[in-house]
Amino acid sequence: PSPCANPEEIAGAFDELRRRGLVRRFGVSNFPVPKFRMLQSYLAEPLLTNQVEASPLHLNAFDDGTIDLALRMRIRPMVWSPLAGGRLFDTQDARSVRVAEALRAVGAPQGEERLDVLALAWLMAHPASIMPVVGSGNPARLRAAAEAVRVKFSEADWISVYAASQGHEVP
């Protein structure tokens, strides 16, 4: 969001679009927690979502309060770049390799080895009910992404991937 964004103007535009029946609900993208709260304070209706970057290699939203705020407000965050822009598949990067091994350790007993499916399943297993945004229009990739719903992560499984990404155990 622009540092000069006027929340009254944004709220007015949202209200007008809703009044005219052009939209039912609104969400925002890449709003840090303070800006999200500030905009929400001007709106008559609650925001539906905040679309943010997150993946097993990009944990900021889990650590900066973004996902915590979504849980508190009972909204489902959307996540862009759920495969870290392809970095998840980098076999030369130590962090990517650790994360891939942790994901496959969870997926193997369930018959799943594909990193894209496992990364999406990991995101969706979070208590915030994260909705990954899959940037592909390729039908085969979309079918694979849909298969992520069948892969289950326990809390311990989820934390094992998070810890692999951080490079140390989670206290």
Outline where the language-model segments fall.
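Beta/alpha (TIM)-barrel catalytic core signal, keyed to glycine-rich beta->alpha loops juxtaposed to Asp/Glu
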Residues: P1-P171
